[in-house]
Design a protein with these regions (language model features):
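Basic/Trp-rich segment in TM-proximal cytosolic loops or flexible interdomain/linker regions
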Residues: 46-47, 106-234, 249-255
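Short, hydrophobic alpha-helical packing/hinge segments within bilobed ligand-binding/sensory domains
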Residues: 81-82, 111
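Catalytic donor-sugar/metal-binding loop of nucleotide-sugar-dependent glycosyltransferases
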Residues: 47, 73, 82-100
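Catalytic cores of eukaryotic secretory-pathway lumenal/extracellular enzymes that build
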Residues: 54, 94, 101-113
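Hydrophobic, well-ordered secondary-structure elements that form the walls
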Residues: 239
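Membrane-embedded alpha-helices of multi-pass transport/permease systems
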Residues: 1, 243-250
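Long helical/loop segments within the catalytic core of UDP-sugar-dependent glycosyltransferases
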Residues: 2-75, 116, 120-127
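Structural detector for helix-capping/boundary residues
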Residues: 61-62, 79, 98
Length: 255
């Protein structure tokens, strides 16, 4: 029924079959549930483009014909496809009743490799599509809104976090050349700022995780204590994206 409304592609509710396995699989699960409920569902209500995630999506034959096949071969081809649709004005919808159950990684090594590929893929999309997306942001109506939404989605926000850490590191290093009383004050202020930033980041992610788990409670196959317990580890899961994002900047990544 959703596809018959004229969409060029339709994405789904992405659930997980192994939420309860450990904090890693739960971290993935919470992220994808949040994506479905609080990103794609509102986008559909507002009439803007959704973005596909993973392999659980449907594509119209006319899209394949218009593109002469499937020309999306970056490391995150799902995001590449979503961005391209926004730029071309093709519509992606969301079907809440179409559910897929992914099996998420359960070891940090598996998770590192997968998210390293995703991070590299996002950088590739940024390189190829930032300018077209920016131009698209100035179009009227749904087209401009969809381009702006995708631009914010793929913007390298983690790099801003890394730059903040680097900047504070430079401040700490520079203060070592200052008199002791001044260096002590600078160190105190800088460390306090960084500690506050980390705490606010943790609390914000904790809130996102809690709201997601509570809203999707009946869809999560896990004991209540596991659902709530893994909310506490969700921010830690997200923190691990920081070293992954750094590695993706310099490391060669392939399928």
């Amino acid at each position: 029924r959703t596809f018959d409304q004229g969409y060029d592609a339709v994405t789904c509710y992405r659930n997980s079959k192994n939420f309860a396995a450990n904090w890693i699989s739960a971290g993935y699960s919470i992220w994808f549930l949040r994506e479905a409920r609080f990103l794609n569902f509102p986008r559909t209500l507002l009439g803007t483009n959704c973005h596909v995630s993973g392999t659980g999506f449907l594509v119209s034959a006319r899209v394949i014909e218009d593109n002469g096949g499937w020309p999306f071969h970056l490391l995150t081809e799902d995001i590449q496809f979503s961005v391209d649709c926004a730029i071309q004005g093709k519509r992606i919808g969301y079907c809440d009743k179409a559910v897929v159950y992914d099996e998420q990684p359960t070891t940090f090594r598996q998770s590192w490799d997968q998210r390293l590929r995703w991070s590299k893929g996002f950088y590739q999309v940024d390189r190829e599509y930032t300018l077209p997306l920016l131009k698209g942001c100035f179009r009227r109506g749904r087209l401009g809104t969809s381009c702006y939404d995708m631009f914010v989605t793929v913007a390298p926000g983690m790099l801003l976090t890394l730059l903040m850490i680097l900047f504070n590191g430079v401040i700490l290093a520079a203060c070592l050349t200052q008199p002791a009383y001044l260096a002590t004050r600078i160190i105190h202020e800088t460390v306090g700022f960084m500690g506050s930033a980390v705490w606010n980041f943790y609390v914000g992610l904790l809130f996102y995780g809690l709201i997601t788990v509570l809203s999707e409670w009946r869809h999560i196959d896990a004991a209540p204590v596991q659902k709530l317990g893994y909310v506490l580890t969700f921010p830690i899961f997200m923190f691990t994206y920081i070293p992954i994002s750094i590695a993706a900047l310099v490391q060669k990544v392939e399928w």
